[in-house]
């Protein structure tokens, strides 16, 4: 199962995405925390808290719409589109890292969070279509392990990159390279047609309200633990 075309390209794609997000986020935080960026318009503590909030905010705003989008279109096609968006964002992020533009990096961090918010639902919605029922638990386990391992490696890599000479320039190249590899991997994900005829409507506020209503359901809330 692991090396099958049904699973492996998708697994590599999502791991590279998690790795890239965390390298970029931690490069930004480390550059600010250790004063590698001059003329920061706000205090370091405020900047770090703002960065954390801006990365998480899209998950509250867009998760409901992201889930509807994941249900309404071919999942492989959606992943490829999201990886192209990631490539565009990281190309801008590479410039921001190289020029040490803190505020631009902050804006791009929000965009990275938004891209991740849309990738999350399709990442899990694809598995039941791609895998056999008896493979689903194993597939979920691989995805969880790959995601958290990628997060850990991303956190460690950010510090190592900035510790070497010309680290910011190398970090700029790394985030672009990982985005490109992620897109190339996504091209090999087989078609996963939508099983729904409903079209997704962009209603972030009402979507958030509906999500909170579902969260109040005891059975749904219990699934979190």
Give residue spans per PLM region:
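Substrate-agnostic recognition of the 12-TM MFS/MFS-like secondary transporter fold
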Residues: 8-25, 51-89, 104-163, 178, ...
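Transmembrane alpha-helix termini and helix-breaking/packing motifs in multi-pass membrane transporters
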Residues: 27-39, 94-99, 151-175
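Extracellular/periplasmic helix-loop-helix junction of adjacent transmembrane segments
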Residues: 27-59
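A single, central transmembrane helix in multi-pass transporters
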Residues: 15, 19, 25-26, 30-32, ...
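Residue-level signature of transmembrane alpha-helical entry/exit and packing/kink sites
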Residues: 6, 10, 44-48, 101, ...
């Amino acid at each position: 199962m692991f090396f099958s075309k049904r699973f492996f390209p998708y697994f590599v794609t999502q791991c590279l995405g998690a790795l890239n997000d965390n390298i970029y986020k931690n490069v930004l935080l480390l550059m600010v925390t250790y004063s590698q960026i001059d003329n920061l318009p706000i205090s370091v503590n405020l900047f770090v808290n703002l960065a954390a909030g801006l990365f998480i905010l899209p998950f509250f705003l867009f998760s409901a719409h992201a889930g509807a989008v994941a249900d309404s279109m071919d999942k492989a096609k959606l992943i490829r589109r999201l990886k192209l968006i990631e490539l565009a964002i990281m190309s801008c992020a590479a410039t921001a890292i190289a020029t040490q533009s803190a505020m631009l990096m902050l804006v791009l961090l929000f965009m990275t969070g938004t891209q991740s918010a849309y990738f999350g639902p399709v990442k899990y919605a694809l598995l039941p279509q791609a895998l056999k029922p008896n493979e689903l638990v194993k597939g979920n386990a691989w995805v969880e392990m790959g995601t958290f391992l990628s997060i850990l490696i991303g956190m460690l890599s950010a510090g190592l990159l900035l510790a070497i000479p010309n680290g910011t320039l190398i970090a700029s190249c790394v985030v672009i390279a990982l985005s490109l590899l992620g897109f190339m991997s996504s091209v090999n994900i087989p078609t996963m047609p939508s099983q729904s005829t409903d079209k997704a409507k962009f209603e972030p506020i009402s979507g958030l309200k509906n999500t909170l209503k579902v969260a109040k359901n005891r059975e749904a809330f219990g699934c979190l633990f």
